[in-house]
Amino acid sequence: MELFYELLLTAAASLLVAFLLARLLASAATASDPRRRAPDHAAVIAEEEAVVVEEERIIEVDEVEVKSARARECVVSEGWVEVGRASSAEGKLECLPEEEEAPAKAARELVLDAVLEEREEEGQVGEERCDLAAAVAEVVGVKPHELGVEAAPGEVSDVTLEEGKVQDVGVEQHDLVAEAAPREALDTGLEKQGVPIIEAVEIKRQDDLGAEVAPSDVPEVEFEQQGVRIIEAIDVNQHHRVALAAPAEVVDAGLEERVQAIEAGSSGLTSETVPEEVLDELSEKQEEQVIEEKEHQLAAATAPVAIPGVALAETEELKEEQSSEKAVNVHEEVQSKDEAKCKLHLVDQQEGSASKVELVGRNTDNVEISHGSSSGDKMIAELTEEELTLQGVPADETQTDMEFGEWEGIERTEIEKRFGVAAAFASSDAGMAALSKLDSDVQLQLQGLLKVAIDGPCYDSTQPLTLRPSSRAKWAAWQKLGNMYPETAMERYMNLLSEAIPGWMGDNISGTKEHEAGDDAVGSVLTMTSNTINQHDSQGNEDNTGMYEGHLTSSPNPEKGQSSDIPAE
């Protein structure tokens, strides 16, 4: 393989060397041969300039030839053409503008210069003069067999074609009685204006060949020329002008009558415009009256609108007040329903104490309650019905509870009595201050136990909304206790309260032993506690005063996501 690669490299090197040698030999041969030398650039540029100069000279020669040709055409077009017509002649003479290389138009249009140029180029001008004369006679001449009256035939007297492109076409006619006046007027007008371009005469014939040509058929003059001056005039014999003065006067008279008719028409128009102005004024007055009436109607319509607007505002205010009153009434009804439900739950617990309070209230005006202290001293306190009412229990409700208790006759147990004392401490100011210093978990446990002890297990309680996290935390603590009995909840509540606040019994009252009549006071305290709890839970307040609020006034535990409120059932 290595040998093969070496051979390939050797071949490539030899090819490269051969190519370079060939290039060197070719360059040497070119340098030695003068014919193969590079061309001189200066010579090439000089040749190109010579070619450009030659082309410019040719263009100038062409322009000079074109200008000379146009000058010859102008000289040819300056010839005079004499046209004569009989009085009863009919037909139409039109001299149209000459255009470069424009063909001759058929029928009544003939461009003599174009025909002359074509004939001159072909070298047949002298041979076909008769044809040109015949063409002129066809356009201008009169054909007697087409007329209904005797008229002298039109004779083309002089048709001369000059080699210098000047033409004179003379047509002599003897009967110019009816046509001389318009021609004379036209001739005088052309002389006064001095217009370089004079239009040819156009005569309109009448259908009635026997009648004379109307004076109003004044010849129309039209000339169109682009860059060429064409002058054509009418040479009329002087001996016929005297006899033809009368038709000119007739024409003037006709024109004066038309002017008078036009003036009369304009005066009639001015007379007719007067009632239009009057009508405009009347219409403007009517519009002003209509506008005034509409303004009065609008003013009358807008005046009473203000009073209904005030009335509507008042009705809206009344509706708002009524809606707010309805909301307050609904809120009060909900509170009353919650209170009634709580009362039904605590009827069994309050009946015994309520009956005793009622009996004592009927028999004696004062209730003696003996409290034993640690030292053995006894204190006597008198609680009247007025003091019970001031504590938050209305007299009517107390009497109703007493009646239920008297009818049932159920006595309270020792646990219920002790729980009543604990609940009374929790609802006091000192108890609320002490509970607020506890941990949020302990507060939630106390809330759940208190709820089970008073309302029972959480069976069908509605879960609070997500927007109230404190209520949801209390409800969760209540539901976590499950189907716990109220007595068990009371006992656990007192034990947890003793662990959290060891001296709560001594701080609340001077002793923990109650008199027999002390059961009545405990029942009243439980009733007040139940009413206060249900009122606050129904309103949804999270930080109001009461038993639940006193238990949880500190900030919730952020780790467990709980707060310090349990919703009412």
From Swiss-Prot:
Superkingdom, taxonomy of origin: Eukaryota
Residues where an acyl-CoA binds: 474, 493
Gene name in the database record: ACBP5
Extent of the signal sequence: 1-31
Role summary: Binds medium- and long-chain acyl-CoA esters with high affinity. Can interact in vitro with palmitoyl-CoA and linolenoyl-CoA. Binds phosphatidic acid (PA) and phosphatidylcholine (PC) in vitro. May play a role in the biosynthesis of phospholipids.
Chief location of this protein within or outside the cell: endoplasmic reticulum
Cellular compartment(s): Endoplasmic reticulum
Taxonomic path: Eukaryota, Viridiplantae, Streptophyta, Embryophyta, Tracheophyta
Annotated tissue distribution: Highly expressed in seeds and leaves. Expressed at low levels in roots.
GO molecular function terms attached to this record: fatty-acyl-CoA binding
Induction annotation: Induced by salt stress and infection with the rice blast fungus Magnaporthe oryzae. Down-regulated by cold stress and wounding.
Biased composition regions of type Polar residues, renumbered to the chain: 533-544, 552-569
Biological process according to GO: fatty acid metabolic process
Stated name of the protein: Acyl-CoA-binding domain-containing protein 5
Start and end residues of each ACB domain: 415-506
UniProt keyword list: Endoplasmic reticulum, Glycoprotein, Lipid-binding, Signal
Glycosylation sites: 508
GO cellular component, one term: endoplasmic reticulum
One matching Pfam family: ACBP
Segments of this protein annotated with the region Disordered: 533-569
Family: Belongs to the ACBP family.
